[in-house]
Amino acid sequence: MDLESAFFNTKDFELTDKKLGKGTFGSVYIARNLKDQQSYATKIIHSESGFDGETQMLLLRESLIHSKLNHPSIIKFKGMNFQSFTNPTQLEPSIITEYLSNGSLKDIFVKIEKNITDFHWNPTKKYIALLGISDAMRYLHKHGIVHRDLKPENILIDGNYHPKICDFGLSRCFPNLLS
């Protein structure tokens, strides 16, 4: 996907009240696409973060890097926008990605630790999950990208309990990758 075609129309989405998480610069909510009724994860940059030139460049860089990625263990980038979901005259940058229903790897660890889930990864499943994450990291490095923020919170789990890397906000790439 090229960045030019990555812009989405906020009118095509309905933002829900369900907050999935909060980071330094923004919060992540579920948004429903009104055309296909699919749910997507939507990272919205906090207005108090200030939407200056530096914030614009960070969002553009994250979107540019993420939009070029295609790997089964990396969350799918769907689009970006600078327009507010609630007030079309306001700037409120956002990024939309696929939505994964089982939360993060950290959420899974907490549930297992508190014994509030019947989910258990046997050694084979752990190995397969680790293999997926390491293959995604190999893919990133092969394409000149350094994630710089890999942690359990940035590894999301899909409906089949396969891990996917997300949040490319701190990522950097080597010069010739995006040319």
What are these regions (language model features)?
Residues 27:
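Conserved N-lobe ATP-binding subsite of Hanks-type protein kinase domains
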Residues 68, 129-130:
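Hydrophobic/aromatic scaffold residues of ePK-like serine/threonine protein kinase catalytic domains
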Residues 76-93:
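Short beta-strand micro-motifs within the conserved protein kinase catalytic domain, predominantly
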Residues 88-104:
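Conserved short submotifs of the Hanks-type protein kinase catalytic core
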Residues 112-129:
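Activation segment of protein kinase catalytic domains, centered on the conserved DFG
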Residues 141-158:
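Catalytic-loop of the protein kinase fold
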